[in-house]
Amino acid sequence: MKNYIVSLSKRALLLSGALAIFTACDDGDLGDIYKGNSSGEYVSDVNWTDAADKSTGTYIKYFYENASGRDTFCGSIYWEKPNTPETGEPASTGGSGGWSQGHALDIVIDAYIRHANNPEYQAHLYENIMKPFLPAFDDWNEHCGYGGKDFWNNFYDDMEWMALSCLRVYELTGDQDYYSALMKMWNHIKGAKNDYKGVGGMAWKTDAPASRMSCSNGPGCLLAMKLYQLTVKEAKDGWEEQAAYYLNFAKEVYNWMTAYLCDISTGQVYDNLSIKDDGTPGDPDKIGRAHV
């Protein structure tokens, strides 16, 4: 097996691949990819599939590159810059950031979906990235400093992002290892809905029960909804009761979040709040976030 490492740049993730598109192309390519008329009604001649593929190719090159001494992927984030294989410098194995590992996998999943008519390329992504990623992520998570066994992580949102990605892989490939990982994470995640002082919502961290953040409530609600849909679709023994549980979980979190961490008149999503000692929600930090 080849040696790989995941080394994710915070900027690259926050810009959702925009910078990666530019680094994927030399100056001669940019004019061919980005065309359009900015006056009047915007019409674009961009081939977005081509642009996405170029971005994904660059992403895989820089963030899933070989790392000496590693026999699997290693989820390890280097916050300030990506690896630069062409320089001959070794890939970074330092840093930590579990929240971005699910996003790393999502980029590969999106490429897998785009190429539904190219089974050879899909097989390449599945065999060379998806399959080795999961056990390596499990190993990294256990030793990252704030994780543990069975995909447990002190940050609920880290587990939620990864669980959402695992669910996507399972739905696309039927990989039972990903389903098992998904359910292990869900068993941890559901504890975030701790009803601390009877207030509701989902905590941000396991050791901060009064914490309430959009990044834990938004994806937590979404995960419960997707588990509801999956349970209904598969209709396994006893599915009705389990589906009802997921649906009720999602509704309760949604109702709480829209009441306390959103301005539904504008669509603004607040960052966080804390539950006060008297059991009332504190004032939210109204810095806008895009977690839902």
Model-derived segments and spans:
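Aromatic- and glycine-enriched pocket-lining scaffold segments that form the walls
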Residues: Q176-W256
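C-terminal motif of bacterial Sec signal peptides marking the signal peptidase cleavage site
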Residues: I21-A24
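Low-complexity, Ser/Thr/Pro/Gly-enriched N-terminal "stalk/linker" regions
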Residues: D26-K149, Q176-V199, I264
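Well-ordered alpha-helical scaffold segments within catalytic/enzyme domains
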Residues: G40-V43, G102-Y121, W161-D175, P219-W239
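Bacterial N-terminal signal peptides that target proteins for export
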Residues: K2-L13
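Conserved small/polar residues in nucleotide/adenosyl-binding loops
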Residues: I287-V292
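Catalytic cores of carbohydrate-active enzymes
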Residues: W239-Q242, Y246-D285
